[in-house]
């Protein structure tokens, strides 16, 4: 019997786990994940593109990639971009690894991190990212829990430090209170400017947008997504 609370290197199993993992997923987490994992104990690279075995021209970050569908879509359409994906939930990471096992050509274009995003953000060099995506994060809908939302001034400071000038932070959600919360915080941060000029800009999906499973669920339940884009000044 496989122990689902074992650890592989860093704290990985035994936390933020939903459905029981299949043996094939456990094998990939043990063998494939360590080859893609970003170890924060290592020295910070002077050039972030050196993290990838493929030659890439830029690096983008997606925080909370779920099952990885959007990341796979982006890698297909942007072959000269290296991607860093953060997903603390084990089941989502396992799904991503299964996809990478099937589409091995993307393994040299992606690095993964399975813990708190703030740790990785603090490790990254200044002005090293060409984009940050945060799509359908946990909305913490109860007002007393809003302080737990990922968007806050401290994390926006982190974004501002690692994003290059002129590059984009993209945020999508179907929860109106979180959209308004994000607009408020970004509008009051000196390093970010909202790109929208008219309502169409935040109601229209991003160029080459693939959607996510969370967005599909929102649409089925009658909630309209909002797509925000902020430029790093």
Swiss-Prot record:
UniProt cross-references to PROSITE patterns, sorted A to Z: SAM_MT_TRMB (PS51625)
Q: Where does S-adenosyl-L-methionine bind?
A: 62, 87, 116, 138
Q: In which pathway does it act?
A: tRNA modification; N(7)-methylguanine-tRNA biosynthesis
Chain positions recorded as substrate binding sites: 142, 174, 212-215
Which Gene3D superfamilies does the UniProt entry name for this protein? Vaccinia Virus protein VP39
Query: Can you cite an annotated GO cellular component?
Result: tRNA methyltransferase complex
Catalysed reactions, as listed in the record? guanosine(46) in tRNA + S-adenosyl-L-methionine = N(7)-methylguanosine(46) in tRNA + S-adenosyl-L-homocysteine
Q: In the Enzyme Commission scheme, what number(s) does this protein have?
A: 2.1.1.33
Among the GO molecular function terms of this UniProt record, one is: tRNA (guanine(46)-N7)-methyltransferase activity
Q: Which InterPro entries match?
A: SAM-dependent_MTases_sf (IPR029063), tRNA_(Gua-N-7)_MeTrfase_Trmb (IPR003358), tRNA_methyltr_TrmB_bact (IPR055361)
Q: Report any Pfam family annotated for this entry.
A: Methyltransf_4
Disulfide bond entries? none
Give the UniProt keywords, A-Z.
Answer: Methyltransferase, S-adenosyl-L-methionine, Transferase, tRNA processing
Q: Which residues form the active site?
A: 138
Please give the function described in this protein's UniProt entry: Catalyzes the formation of N(7)-methylguanine at position 46 (m7G46) in tRNA.
| Family to which the UniProt record says this protein belongs | Belongs to the class I-like SAM-binding methyltransferase superfamily. TrmB family.
Alphabetical list of PANTHER family matching this protein: 3-DEOXY-D-MANNO-OCTULOSONIC-ACID TRANSFERASE/TRNA GUANINE-N 7 - -METHYLTRANSFERASE, PENTACOTRIPEPTIDE-REPEAT REGION OF PRORP DOMAIN-CONTAINING PROTEIN
**What HAMAP family does the entry give?**
tRNA_methyltr_TrmB
Protein name, UniProt field: tRNA (guanine-N(7)-)-methyltransferase
Q: Which organism is it from?
A: Bartonella henselae (strain ATCC 49882 / DSM 28221 / CCUG 30454 / Houston 1) (Rochalimaea henselae)
